[in-house]
C-alpha cells in the first residue's frame, strides 16, 4: 500500500479524498495550524494532520498540493529537498520565474520530481508534443460566470453585479494572468509551461452572465499544424471557483502514482 501526503484540505481536497484509488492510503494532511483540529475531525484518526512538512513521521510515496499558491511557496521546496515527488495543481505559482528556478534546482539536487497537473483543461499533452516540432502561437481564452470571478482582480476591471453580456475584461500574457488572477488562472500557467512559456502565451479572460459553467479554449499553431481545443466544465458545487475536472485531474495523478501503466 503506497502512502500519500496531501497539502491542503478544502473543497477540492475533500473531493480527492473521497475518490482515492484503493492502493493509495492518505497518511498525512498539511494545513495551517489553526485548521488542524477542524480537519482532524473530518478524516480518519489514522491520518496525521500537521502544519509543517518537518512534522511528517514517515516517507510518502506521493505528495499532492491542493491548497493554493501560498501553500506552494511554503511547502513545495521542503518536499523536493527531501527527495519526494510532488504534484502541483496551483501551477500559477510558477509565474514567479525565480521561484520556478529554485524548485527546479532543488529537485535536481535531491533527485526529486515536480509534476504539473493538467487541472481544468484538456490537451496539455498535445501542446507539449507540438512544442517539440516548432510551436509558434498559443492563445488561451477563459470564460466564466460573474459568480466564478467574484473575489478576484476581475472585480476591479468590470462590474460583475451588473454585467449584461459577455465582456472581455483582460488581455495579456500568461504570466500577467497568473499573477493577477491566482485563484482562476492556473490553466493559463499550465498551458504556458507546456508550450511557449509565460511571456509568449496570450490570454483572454471573459465574464458571461448567460452561462453557469466554465469555458476554456486553446488555439495553437505551428509546424505540427493547427489545434483548437474547447472544454465546457462544471464547477464543484462546494466551490464555484474550482473546476470539477481539476479535482479529477488530481485523482488521476494519484491513480497514476500506483499504476504500472500510466496514461
UniProtKB/Swiss-Prot annotation:
Molecular-function annotations in GO: aspartate dehydrogenase activity; NAD binding; NADP binding; oxidoreductase activity, acting on the CH-NH2 group of donors, NAD or NADP as acceptor
EC number(s) on file: 1.4.1.21
Keyword terms: NAD, NADP, Oxidoreductase, Pyridine nucleotide biosynthesis
Pathway linked to the protein: Cofactor biosynthesis; NAD(+) biosynthesis; iminoaspartate from L-aspartate (dehydrogenase route): step 1/1
Domain of life: Bacteria
Reaction(s) catalysed (UniProt annotation): L-aspartate + NADP(+) + H2O = oxaloacetate + NH4(+) + NADPH + H(+); L-aspartate + NAD(+) + H2O = oxaloacetate + NH4(+) + NADH + H(+)
UniProt keyword NADP present: yes
Location of the active site: 216
Signal sequence range: none
Enzyme class: oxidoreductase
Residues annotated to bind NAD(+): 120, 186
Pfam families per record: Asp_DH_C, NAD_binding_3
This protein's record includes keyword Nucleotide-binding: no
BP terms from Gene Ontology: NAD biosynthetic process
InterPro entries named in the record: Asp/hSer_DH_NAD-bd, Asp_DH, Asp_DH_prok, L-Asp_DH, NAD(P)-bd_dom_sf
Similarity field: Belongs to the L-aspartate dehydrogenase family.
HAMAP family in the record: NadX
More about this protein: The iminoaspartate product is unstable in aqueous solution and can decompose to oxaloacetate and ammonia.
UniProt function note: Specifically catalyzes the NAD or NADP-dependent dehydrogenation of L-aspartate to iminoaspartate.
PANTHER family with a match to the protein in the record: ASPARTATE DEHYDROGENASE DOMAIN-CONTAINING PROTEIN, L-ASPARTATE DEHYDROGENASE-RELATED
Protein's recorded name: L-aspartate dehydrogenase
Organism field: Acinetobacter baumannii (strain ATCC 17978 / DSM 105126 / CIP 53.77 / LMG 1025 / NCDC KC755 / 5377)
Amino acid at each position: 500500500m503506497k502512502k500519500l501526503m496531501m497539502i491542503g484540505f478544502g473543497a477540492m481536497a475533500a473531493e480527492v479524498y473521497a475518490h482515492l484509488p484503493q492502493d493509495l492510503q492518505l497518511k498525512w494532511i498539511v494545513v495551517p495550524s489553526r485548521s488542524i483540529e477542524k480537519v482532524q475531525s473530518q478524516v480518519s484518526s489514522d491520518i496525521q494532520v500537521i502544519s509543517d512538512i518537518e512534522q511528517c513521521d514517515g516517507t510518502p510515496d506521493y505528495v499532492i498540493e491542493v491548497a493554493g499558491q501560498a501553500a506552494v511557496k511554503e511547502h513545495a521546496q521542503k518536499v523536493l529537498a527531501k527527495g519526494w515527488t510532488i504534484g502541483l495543481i496551483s501551477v500559477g505559482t510558477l509565474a514567479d520565474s525565480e521561484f520556478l528556478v529554485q524548485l527546479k534546482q532543488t529537485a535536481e539536487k535531491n533527485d526529486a520530481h515536480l509534476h504539473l497537473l493538467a487541472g481544468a483543461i484538456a490537451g496539455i499533452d498535445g501542446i507539449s508534443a507540438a512544442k517539440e516540432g516548432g510551436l509558434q502561437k498559443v492563445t488561451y481564452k477563459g470564460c466564466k460566470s460573474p459568480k466564478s470571478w467574484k473575489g478576484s482582480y476581475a472585480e476591479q476591471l468590470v462590474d460583475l453585479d451588473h454585467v449584461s453580456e459577455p465582456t472581455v475584461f483582460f488581455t495579456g500574457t500568461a504570466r500577467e494572468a497568473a499573477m493577477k488572477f491566482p485563484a482562476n488562472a492556473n490553466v493559463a500557467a499550465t498551458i504556458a509551461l507546456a508550450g511557449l512559456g509565460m511571456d509568449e502565451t496570450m490570454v483572454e479572460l471573459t465574464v458571461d452572465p448567460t452561462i453557469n459553467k466554465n469555458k476554456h479554449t486553446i488555439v495553437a499553431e505551428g509546424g505540427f499544424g493547427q489545434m483548437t481545443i474547447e472544454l465546457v466544465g462544471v464547477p464543484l458545487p462546494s466551490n464555484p471557483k474550482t473546476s470539477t475536472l481539476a479535482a479529477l485531474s488530481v485523482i488521476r495523478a494519484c491513480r497514476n502514482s500506483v499504476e504500472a501503466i500510466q496514461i
